[in-house]
Amino acid sequence: MQWASILLLRGLCSLSQGQYEEDSHWWLQYLRNQQSTYYDPYDTYPYETSDPYPYEVEEGPAYAYGAPPPPEPRDCPQECDCPPNFPTAMYCDNRNLKYLPFVPSRMKYVYFQNNQIAAIQEGVFDNATGLLWIALHGNQITSDKIGRKVFSKLRHLERLYLDHNNLTRMPGPLPRSLRELHLDHNQISRVPNNALEGLENLTALYLHHNEIQEVGSSMRGLRSLILLDLSYNHLRRVPDGLPSALEQLYLEHNNVYTVPDSYFRGSPKLLYVRLSHNSLTNNGLATNTFNSSSLLELDLSYNQLQKIPPVNTNLENLYLQGNRINEFSISSFCTVVDVMNFSKLQVLRLDGNEIKRSAMPVDAPLCLRLASLIEI
């Protein structure tokens, strides 16, 4: 009986030792698994450095997850990822999709960018009326393939990305809740007066890199609009009236040749105006066109100006390079030059004109005493 007990103990020890040797490398296998499933929450997304799109899109709260995702819920489309630790987000980007999959009702953030989607069929979002964020940029969507009421039922939608598609018309109707609308890099040719009707909560509108020739008075009712980007279009006239809350206006690379007198008076919060690469002449500008006390930066470079237009003394940065300016008039900056009256201008670019540094009047240092850079 004693010998039997000894043999039994030896067997158990051997078995335990073998099991230990077999499991001693468990941590290596664990690291391999972690390496293959780890998701870096700080990856640039959706615009990576290799991406052809130069404009960044602010990352939404749906990108704030970092742990390796557990198995996906059953109601997530098989073409997409639905991380359980952020259950209201659905990722279907960069998957060569040609159609929009089913959207579960709990979703608030859906990402369909960089696919081959050509249509947004009517009713595709009817099951998820609580959506806040829809990313559809970088697809092949055309205007005639968008359901008439596909967005109007989404009463909580705040951000809509439809840039880098094949749109020829403004989509609509759109929900009043919308705060950001990205329609840049399409082929839109005009903005009808009622195209943005009711969007009183819209704060940013991106329409750059289109083929827009006129916008009429479509911007007047956007009372919350802070940023308007209409650059790289075919505009010959500025919009008829600007929103009162506007702070940033981008109109560079158009064919604008005139700006009405006191045009910016209705936008007392306006800080930045870019009108470079247009067809502006002094005949197309009134005396008080740019005499806005709120303006901090004004870009009029690469136009056809022959004189420096009068600006407000509060202006800090003025870009006039690449024009035909042939004289330096100090009255454009200071109507009266003395110890108490001077311009707050810090940067003045006049290079690439028909003027020499010797043309600066003797009282220029007194008027432009705060300037840190004057390029002639």
Curated annotation (Swiss-Prot):
Sorted keywords for this record are:
Disulfide bond, Extracellular matrix, Glycoprotein, Leucine-rich repeat, Proteoglycan, Pyrrolidone carboxylic acid, Repeat, Secreted, Signal, Sulfation
Q: Entry's PROSITE patterns? A: LRR
Positions of LRR repeats: 106-127, 130-143, 156-176, 177-198, 201-222, 224-245, 246-266, 269-289, 294-315, 316-335, 344-367
Residue numbers of Sulfotyrosine PTMs: Y20, Y38, Y53, Y55, Y63, Y65
Annotated Gene Ontology cellular component terms: extracellular region; extracellular space
- Give the sugar-modified residues: N127, N166, N201, N291, N341
Intrachain disulfide bonds: C334-C367
Any Pfam family hit: LRR_8
Residues found modified as Pyrrolidone carboxylic acid? Q19
GO terms for biological process, alphabetical: skin development
The superkingdom listed in its UniProt entry is Eukaryota
UniProt cross-references to InterPro entries, sorted A to Z: Leu-rich_rpt, Leu-rich_rpt_typical-subtyp, LRR_dom_sf, LRRNT, SLRP
**UniProt signal peptide:** 1-18
Q: What family is reported?
A: Belongs to the small leucine-rich proteoglycan (SLRP) family. SLRP class II subfamily.
The protein's name in its UniProt record: Fibromodulin
* Organism, as annotated: Rattus norvegicus (Rat)
